[in-house]
UniProtKB/Swiss-Prot annotation:
Domain of life, source organism: Eukaryota
Region of interest: Necessary for TNNT2 exon 5 inclusion: 239-258
GO molecular function, one term: pre-mRNA binding
Native species: Homo sapiens
Region (Disordered): 18-39, 121-149
Main subcellular location of this protein, as a coarse class: nucleus
Keywords per UniProt: Activator, Cytoplasm, mRNA processing, mRNA splicing, Nucleus, Repeat, RNA-binding
Protein role: RNA-binding protein implicated in the regulation of pre-mRNA alternative splicing. Mediates exon inclusion and/or exclusion in pre-mRNA that are subject to tissue-specific and developmentally regulated alternative splicing. Specifically activates exon 5 inclusion of cardiac isoforms of TNNT2 during heart remodeling at the juvenile to adult transition. Promotes exclusion of both the smooth muscle (SM) and non-muscle (NM) exons in actinin pre-mRNAs. Activates the splicing of MAPT/Tau exon 10.
Name of the molecule in the record: CUGBP Elav-like family member 4
Gene3D superfamilies registered for this protein in UniProt: 3.30.70.330
């Protein structure tokens, strides 16, 4: 006796037969699970999967391939239960990865063994990734899967540059089965003195580290052998970003609030040296030049700690002797110009505060647009305007004439790239301006790109990058018809 019933698979109904004498299925059925059989003649039959089937994550796939293009690649390992390409929920753009579930567990293991890091798809720089999804790795079947590559891949440094791959293999094969051994070489083909060694298990890699790290010094090497786990791709990307941030004075989180002060102090010290060298050529030290140099030194020292320095006040005025000329004094770009800095009140003795910036012969740019001011303007927003050279016309007159006034800057209208190429960035420090933003995203083209591929590359590298106590959030700007730009 057979009872007609409906079963659900992925939310769709399908007719099945259940035998009353146990678990039965009709001959030639496509598959069975818990006694449910499917009629092969029904074109709408939903395939069934094993109860212990593995959900695979597929990475490094071209963004122009969808499910129907990927299906032939994976079908050779078994019947596919579900294949889904991941897309951005706002833009619908391909993320370059997918989830795959086979009907049978063995098919997933075969596909992982045959494809993971073994084949590079057209248009990609790295081999395809086929591994259990995160949800699967937390299950109880992890013992049947291969350990992640980063848990068993070693970096070996301080090798003899004359050693070959075979020499390195002989050194490491005593600790386990070696799957890969690659010596890093330069464009000329010569060894760089380092290599990557991949074992078949994490325990073997750990044993090699314990036995060989620092154990000997190879001939021609400057220090003992280095054996450690290789960095992951994410760690390498983060290190590159931190190096780039360090060049901009942002490596230390505490340096961010005072980055503008540090740049100001550094430029002051550089100009102090140039000023002193210039006046030294004349054999006579102008009292005002000496005062300006000392004042710059004081401000630079205090500003290195993020503090605003009170300028020293000269005890007497002075004029420049006829034999002293000023054209040799170089100028400092706009970060040292007044640019809207406001500043210190008059001194107690009644004399106005001398201006360190004008010791360099640079006038404020009255025609400059406030929007074009650099981030230093925000850093010194609470300081009153200096009295400037009006207090000491004789001291500053010759230097001021040596530098013509720059033409007024015309504000430029903000430009945007085409649709799908504009990024919106959260959690930027308040001290950041256009210049800092440009430096951070310069390796990727710019914040507004001219093609979606560059925008996606920037998102992958910079999303989650930590600056100070916050992490950047980088995503595509929403379409213009959306309610919000982010």
């Amino acid at each position: 006796m057979y009872i007609k019933m409906a079963t659900l698979a992925n939310g769709q109904a399908d007719n099945a037969s259940l035998s009353t004498n146990g678990l039965g299925s009709s001959p030639g059925s496509a598959g069975h699970m818990n006694g449910l059989s499917h009629s092969p003649g029904n074109p709408s039959t939903i395939p069934m999967k094993d109860h212990d089937a593995i959900k695979l994550f597929i990475g490094q796939i071209p963004r122009n391939l969808d499910e129907k293009d990927l299906k032939p690649l994976f079908e050779e390992f078994g019947k596919i239960y579900e294949l889904t390409v991941l897309k951005d929920r706002f833009t619908g753009m391909h993320k370059g990865c997918a989830f795959l579930t086979y009907c049978e567990r063995e098919s997933a293991l075969k596909a992982q063994s045959a494809l993971h890091e073994q084949k590079t798809l057209p248009g990609m720089n790295r081999p395809i990734q086929v591994k259990p999804a995160d949800s699967e790795s937390r299950g109880g079947s992890s013992c049947l899967r291969q350990p992640p590559s980063q848990d068993r891949k070693l970096f070996v440094g301080m090798l003899n540059k004359q050693q070959s791959e075979d020499d390195v293999r002989r050194l490491f094969e005593a600790f386990g089965n070696i799957e890969e051994c690659t010596i890093l070489r330069g464009p000329d083909g010569n060894s760089k003195g380092c290599a990557f060694v991949k074992y078949s298990s994490h325990a073997e890699a750990q044993a090699a580290i314990n036995a060989l790290h620092g154990s000997q010094t190879m001939p021609g090497a400057s220090s003992s052998l280095v054996v450690k786990f290789a960095d992951t791709d994410k760690e390498r990307t983060m290190r590159r970003m931190q190096q780039m941030a360090g060049q901009m004075g942002m490596f230390n989180p505490m340096a961010i609030p005072f980055g503008a002060y540090g740049a100001y102090a550094q430029a002051l010290m550089q100009q102090q040296a140039a000023l002193m060298a210039s006046v030294a050529q004349g054999g006579y030290l102008n009292p005002m030049a000496a005062f300006a140099a000392a004042q710059m030194q004081q401000m630079a020292a205090l500003n290195m700690n993020g503090l605003a320095a009170a300028p020293m006040t000269p005890t007497s005025g002075g004029s420049t002797p006829p034999g002293i000329t000023a054209p040799a004094v170089p100028s400092i770009p706009s970060p040292i110009g007044v640019n809207g800095f406001t500043g210190l009140p008059p001194q107690a003795n009644g004399q106005p505060a001398a201006e360190a910036v004008f010791a360099n012969g640079i006038h404020p740019y009255p025609a400059q647009s406030p929007t074009a001011a650099d981030p230093l303007q925000q850093a010194y927003a609470g300081v009153q305007q200096y009295a400037g050279p009006a207090a000491y016309p004789a001291a500053y007159g010759q230097i001021s004439q040596a530098f013509p006034q720059p033409p007024p800057m015309i504000p430029q209208q903000q430009r945007e790239g085409p649709e799908g190429c504009n990024l919106f960035i959260y959690h930027l420090p308040q001290e950041f301006g256009d210049a800092e933003l440009m430096q951070m995203f310069l390796p990727f083209g710019f914040v507004s790109f001219d093609n979606p591929a560059s925008a996606q590359t920037a998102i992958q590298a910079m999303n989650g990058f930590q600056i100070g106590m916050k992490r950047l959030k980088v995503q595509l700007k929403r379409p213009k018809d959306a309610n919000r730009p982010y």
